[in-house]
């Protein structure tokens, strides 16, 4: 029964990671490409090649076919022609886990971070409410500090949340060549 429970937890973590964690390099890559366009470091002929260079570097994927010289694959993502920054999605992912870990710590939770629930916890609710009540009246580092005790963003909480999954994946992939 304990083994089945562990498998269920790993399955849930895998599902969550495939929905959320894989978005982190995509969101970073997309705005890195946008910034290179805006700062003028790319000419028109390099736009698509640089897109695929970043996709390979950050996501480990390549175009399934050779791309013609006039291809503009970035335009398929509506945020590109719509000139919509994507950094907000990157920050949201990082902050989601940072907030969760801080709120779990505020209620003295002990255990794997993915098992913590802040539901109906008065202390966690008060911290979250106090931060949200600030609205735009304070700089964001002040709001972050209210809930986390820190003034900087950190990806450590994301790593802590998925630590059991990473441990399992490391074991499954032992003696295998993984990566790009």
Where are these regions (language model features)?
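C-terminal, non-catalytic "cap/extension" segments appended to globular domains
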Residues: 3, 7, 11-13, 19-180
């Amino acid at each position: 029964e304990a083994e089945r429970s562990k498998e269920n937890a790993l399955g849930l973590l895998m599902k969550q990671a495939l929905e959320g964690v894989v978005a982190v390099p995509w969101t970073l890559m997309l705005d890195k490409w946008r910034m290179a366009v805006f700062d003028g470091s790319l000419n028109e002929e390099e736009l698509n090649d640089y897109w695929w260079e970043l996709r390979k570097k950050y996501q480990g994927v390549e175009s399934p076919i050779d791309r013609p010289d006039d291809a503009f694959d970035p335009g398929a993502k509506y945020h590109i022609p719509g000139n919509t920054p994507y950094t907000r999605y990157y920050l949201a992912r990082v902050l989601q886990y940072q907030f969760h870990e801080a709120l779990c710590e505020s209620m003295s939770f002990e255990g794997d971070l993915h098992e913590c629930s802040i539901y109906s916890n008065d202390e966690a609710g008060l911290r979250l409410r106090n931060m949200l009540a600030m609205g735009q009246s304070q700089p964001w580092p002040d709001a972050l500090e209210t809930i986390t005790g820190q003034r900087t963003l950190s990806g450590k909480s994301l790593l802590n949340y998925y630590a059991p999954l990473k441990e399992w994946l490391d074991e499954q992939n032992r003696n295998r060549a993984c990566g790009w």
